[in-house]
Amino acid sequence: MPELNMRVAIAGTCGLALLIAKEINEYTSHQLIILSRSQQTGLIAQGYECATVDYNNPSSIHHALMGVDTVISTVSGTPQLRLIEAAVQCRVRRFAPAEFEGQPRLREQNDILDCGKRSALALLQHYRGYIQSTIFICGILYERFSVNGMLSHRIGTSTGCGNEGDYIANARYMTSMAPVYDTQQNLSCLCLTSAYDVAQFVVRALDMPIWAPEMSMYGERMTVNSLVELIRACRNRPWTSIEYQDPANLQYKLTMAQMAGDTATQRRLAPLLATAEGCYDFAVPGFLNQLNPDIVPTRFQTWFLQNWASIP
C-alpha cells in the first residue's frame, strides 16, 4: 500500500535533488520541503516549500525537520552527519544518505572521492535501532558523459571530476582512457542510469512500507568496451586516441599521482580504477526495476544522441 501524505525533506539543491523534488510534486500527494544553505527564491516562486538551514546550528536543522517522515540527502561531509544526528533526535523515520553510485562495500578505504560517505553510513548503522535507512545504488549516472560534464546539471560539484571528458571518454575531442579489463583480465562491466530515472525510482521507493538496506536500479548494463564503442558510433568519428587500461596499470598511475601530490589526476583516476574493479557493477535487473516494471529507463544510446545532438 502506498504511504499517504508523508512529509519528505530533500537536503540539497543539486540537479538530482531537484529532479527528485519535481517527481514528488508532480506524481505524489506527499508534502515536500527542500533544505538549502541559501535562500531559494527561484524555487519558492515555482511553488516549492524551502527552508534555509544552517548546518552549524542544530536548532536550525531541528526546526526544518519538524514533522518530517523521510529525509533524502544530497549533501555530504559534516553537514550530512549533522543532518543524520538531527533526524534521529527529531524521530525522522527514514533517511537516504547521499550515495547514488556503486556498492559502498566495494569502495576503497582511503577513497579520495569519499566526501564523508563512509562516516555517514557508520553513523546510520550506529542509529539503526532508531532510524531506517537505505543506500540507493544506480551505478554511473549518464550525466557523467554530458556535454559540459555533469557539472552542467549541477551534479558532482564536490567530486572534482565532474567536467566534460573527466570519466572514460572525451566525446568532443574523441579521446578515451577506458578501464576495459578487470583484475582477471576479463572485460569489465558497469551499470549506468540517467538522473531522471534515478529520481523516478527513488520517489517510488517512498511508498514502500519497509526499506531494504540497499536498493539498486539501473538503466543499462554493459562492458566498458561496449560503452566506448557505442560512444564512438554515436559520434560517428574515430577515436583520436584511446588507452585500454587494467587495474594494475591504473593503480600505478594513481600511485604516481599520489607521490606527485597531483590531486586533480587522482580524482580522475580513482573512478576509472573503481570501474575496472567492478565497483559500479551489480546484478540486474535492479531491485527497484523488478518492483516497478512499468518504469522503462532511457537507454544510454538514446540519452547520448539527444544530449550531443547539437555538437558536431
Q: What does each of the following model-derived ranges do?
A:
Residues 286-312:
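Amphipathic terminal alpha-helices
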Residues 85, 196-204, 301, 305:
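Amphipathic alpha-helical segments that line or abut small-molecule/effector binding pockets
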Residues 56-62, 141-144, 247-254:
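A short acidic, often aromatic-flanked loop/helix-cap motif at beta-alpha or helix-coil junctions
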